[in-house]
Amino acid sequence: MAPSFDTLTEQDLHEEEEEEIDFSDLKEQYEVKLEEGLDTFVVIDGLPVVPEESRQKLIKFLLRKLNTVGHTSEDAVFMPLNDKNMSEGFAFVEYETPEQAIAAVKQLHGVPLDKKHTLAVNKLMDIDRYGREGRIDEEYKPPTIEPFKEKEHLRSWLGDANARDQFALYRGDKVGVFWNNKSNPPENVVDRAHWTQLFVQWSPKGTYLASVHPQGVQLWGGPAFSKQKQFPHPFVQLVEFSPGESYLTTWSARPIQVEEGHPVLTYEEDGKNIIIWDIVTGKPLRSFVSHDLTAGPGGDGEPKKKVQWPAFKWSADEKYVARMQQHQSISIYELPRMNLLGKTSVKIDGVMDFEWSPATVVREGVKQYEQLLCFWTPEIGSNPARVALMSVPSKEIVRTRNLFNVSDVKLHWQSQGTYVCVKVDRHSKSKKSMATNLEIFRVREKGVPVEVVDSLKDTVINFAWEPNGGRFVAITTGEAPSGAAVLPKTSVSFFAPEKKGVSAGNFKVVRTIEKKTSNAIYWSPKGRFVVVATVHSQTNFDIDFWDMDFEGEKPEGEKDLAANLQLMKTVEHYGVTDIDWDPTGRYVVSSASVWTHSMENGYNIHTFAGQTLAEHPTDKFKQFIWRPRPPTLLSKEEQKQVRKNLREYSKEFDEEDKYAVDIANTAVVETRKRVLNEWAAWIRREKEMLAEEKDAYGVPEDVDSSKQAKDAPAVSEDQGETVVEEIVEEIIEENEEVIG
């Protein structure tokens, strides 16, 4: 019978009281914390010793400094006097909040009050905590020095005898790092379950592998991928490295809540979304609140917000980092102090986007150091849209260009900073049709001339410069009907400069391939080869491999251009979502991630020319990323010498490849020999057992078979002349014909 109130005993009532629901976690979360303690007090030391009649005057003078970091008053400053009615050289100050007290310690400690006196500011709680009797041992004891432990070599993978590359593979709940073995199965380096909660990311030079967790970010490295650094940022969602791996930016949609006594984070980070970290020390340099971008009206008419990422963009040499407040300004900070350059942001009305040059540029006629930054503003009232180049640290505008009838602008720097292409989407006066112009700034030339490429009649949906080169590819499309299930037809245009002596000539179309569905461009990191693909499609999966410097016959109409275009191969990869070149430009991986769809997930490895080496269907495949390599240490002369002797090196590499194949074939032959020996031994044993049974039952012995069993020779591994023949049948063609 089910228990009821009437059937409850006295013992049951007491048990109910004992088993009362525990609300302690909810109480802790929602409890109103009363202010208590001495967190709002600071102690100011290093003050002048003055008589009682001058004390008030000194307090008023001191308040000028104190109120620069918070709010306090004369009543909140206590300056004690001794028996001689003279001040003691220190004072107690109460601020309105603990955060103001922390700011006073950070910003006023060590600040001169006048020529003879320098302020020493400490929290009263710290003095109580560390200065209490018994906390400090008055007798000196030398510190314990830990025995030296040699650190792991963080770039050990570069010493691989076969110059192989590594990649990280995230599938299911496991993350592994593997060696690429071309067509052979990859060799595992490390494989761990639950290594990350969101994704993994390599640092730009491949030194660290970052894993993302609710508690923060961890960096791993060395031959065994041991833990190198930790960056506690609760509920972190995005990470970004600086180009030289010195700094790390982390972002979370949730404002940080710093608990008292946190070993790394302080009240300065409380309520912030973004932290910039020093990777070497593992400490935060500065924290910020997010600035969201507007992304057009939402369904309810309200403007949608999208995350501005990367929130901070780095100069090529890591000396500066900048962020944009859309429509208002660009703030440039100096590293490593993270102070605002010139103490003010650059006010730019309407600013929509900006990009640093990816390399330090030396402009013609300019001798002083500079980093270049490009930004654009839309049309405001009667003022045209504008693209400008700014020199940093001077903040001088070195080139501007006005634009009209602008719908959108995208900025594309060439990897060496030689060019910046401004992709301008223009609307007609009736605003019913769209077209794209390319405005190319020749940054290194005197006066920064601008070349306009207006041969494209449709809208450019993708654009990519050749790394370390002067060619580019653009994909265009007409206006697709909204809600169309079929991909719109696209055209792929290959551009190259004309041959004109030392300097590059104007950009001309090498060739345009029409009636495609391609929507993505992936250049080899070494240039020359480019993959043009259709990704994130449900119907088309073409991957085209192009060579821009084909060594065959050049068409007559393209002889004046610095290119010889050739389609090497087209392959298909069902459901392809991502394409990744390895850092040497030898291999390409196409992959289908479960993050996009759950059909036939996995990855395929191809050569640069499109030959498929291996297919790896992988259940719950999520992410494939090659490990980057640091820049080469060879000088330009040494690199030139290597290219000159490349044919000789190629012979050595071919011999090594042949030797590796021979070893693999030898292993197969040895395995087959072993299996054959085992089979022959089994036959011999069976025949001997059969002969013994016949003898036991009095069955006449077959002399020939017994003799054959005893005389059956073993296949020795030392017999070099043993030939193992394997017959493989393959159907070349099959025809079915109906007769009658």
From Swiss-Prot:
Region (Disordered): 1-22, 695-721
Domain RRM: 40-126
InterPro entries linked: EIF3B, eIF3B_RRM, Nucleotide-bd_a/b_plait_sf, RBD_domain_sf, RRM_dom, TIF_beta_prop-like, WD40/YVTN_repeat-like_dom_sf
Cellular component terms (Gene Ontology): cytoplasmic stress granule; eukaryotic 43S preinitiation complex; eukaryotic 48S preinitiation complex; eukaryotic translation initiation factor 3 complex, eIF3e; eukaryotic translation initiation factor 3 complex, eIF3m; multi-eIF complex
Single annotated GO MF: translation initiation factor activity
Keyword Metal-binding attached: no
Polar residues: compositionally biased ranges: 1-10
Regions of compositional bias (Acidic residues) in chain numbering: 13-22
WD repeats: 193-230, 232-289, 302-343, 513-556, 571-609
Subcellular location as annotated: Cytoplasm
PROSITE patterns: RRM
Family matches, as PANTHER family: EUKARYOTIC TRANSLATION INITIATION FACTOR 3 EIF3 -RELATED, EUKARYOTIC TRANSLATION INITIATION FACTOR 3 SUBUNIT B
Family to which this protein belongs: Belongs to the eIF-3 subunit B family.
Function according to Swiss-Prot or TrEMBL: RNA-binding component of the eukaryotic translation initiation factor 3 (eIF-3) complex, which is involved in protein synthesis of a specialized repertoire of mRNAs and, together with other initiation factors, stimulates binding of mRNA and methionyl-tRNAi to the 40S ribosome. The eIF-3 complex specifically targets and initiates translation of a subset of mRNAs involved in cell proliferation.
Description of how the protein assembles with itself and partners: Component of the eukaryotic translation initiation factor 3 (eIF-3) complex.
Name the UniProt record assigns to this protein: Eukaryotic translation initiation factor 3 subunit B
UniProt source species: Aspergillus niger (strain ATCC MYA-4892 / CBS 513.88 / FGSC A1513)
Source organism phylogeny: Eukaryota, Fungi, Dikarya, Ascomycota, Pezizomycotina
